[in-house]
C-alpha cells in the first residue's frame, strides 16, 4: 500500500535524537494510529511501550532487538516486530523511510 486514505495527520512533527529521527502521527477512523518517518544515518536505541511493527518503505537498516546478540538486516519491503515494553537498536547508513504500526 503506497498511501493511506481517509486519515488525519498531526501537523507537529515528532523529533527525536536531535533530529536524526523525525515522524508524523497518522490517525485512522477506527482510532488506530501509525507514524510515518525518516531516520538519518546513525545508530539509535528505541524503547517500546506497546508492541510495534516497523515497515521499511525505502532504504535499509540493521536491527538488534533487546536481549539478542545478533543483528538482522532489512530493506525496503521488509518489516520487523518489536514486543511491548522492550527496545531495539537500529543502524542506518543511508536515509531510512518507515511506517511504524502500533498494537
Swiss-Prot record:
Its source organism is: Methylococcus capsulatus (strain ATCC 33009 / NCIMB 11132 / Bath)
Keyword list (alphabetical) reads:
Glycosyltransferase, Transferase
Record EC number? 2.4.2.1, 2.4.2.2
Instruction: Please provide one cellular component term from the Gene Ontology annotations of this protein.
Output: cytosol
Q: Name one GO molecular function term.
A: guanosine phosphorylase activity
Question: Which CDD domains does the annotation name?
Answer: cupin_PpnP-like
Residue ranges of the TM segments: none
Q: Which family does it belong to?
A: Belongs to the nucleoside phosphorylase PpnP family.
What is the reaction catalyzed? Answer: a purine D-ribonucleoside + phosphate = a purine nucleobase + alpha-D-ribose 1-phosphate; adenosine + phosphate = alpha-D-ribose 1-phosphate + adenine; cytidine + phosphate = cytosine + alpha-D-ribose 1-phosphate; guanosine + phosphate = alpha-D-ribose 1-phosphate + guanine
Annotated signal sequence is none
Primary role: Catalyzes the phosphorolysis of diverse nucleosides, yielding D-ribose 1-phosphate and the respective free bases. Can use uridine, adenosine, guanosine, cytidine, thymidine, inosine and xanthosine as substrates. Also catalyzes the reverse reactions.
**Any one Pfam family match given in the protein's UniProt record, by short name:** Ppnp
Q: What is this protein called?
A: Pyrimidine/purine nucleoside phosphorylase
